[in-house]
């Protein structure tokens, strides 16, 4: 099931996404987030996390880093980018 979902997202990235102008306000992009979430948390939780991310991605949201969290969550991951910046500054 995991492979089927990842292949579906790859199909979207290859055939559908290029037709539209870039609109994702987060890094990584919503489709890459979906793939990472599926690979890290499994098909059901990953699909739920990816869908929640797509619903968060709109013109009125605050853009920025939103990495796949270590633990399952449907909310935006605010803490990890700050930790990453602290590690990079050392």
Curated annotation (Swiss-Prot):
Cellular component, GO, one term: plasma membrane
Compartments it resides in: Cell membrane
Main localization of the protein described in the UniProt heading: membrane
Source species, domain of life: Bacteria
InterPro entries: Membr_insert_effic_factor_YidD (IPR002696)
Keyword field contains Membrane: yes
Annotated membrane topology: Peripheral membrane protein
Keywords: Cell membrane, Membrane
Function of the protein: Could be involved in insertion of integral membrane proteins into the membrane.
Sequence similarity: Belongs to the UPF0161 family.
Protein name: Putative membrane protein insertion efficiency factor
Naturally occurring in which organism (per UniProt): Lactococcus lactis subsp. cremoris (strain SK11)
Origin organism lineage: Bacteria, Bacillati, Bacillota, Bacilli, Lactobacillales
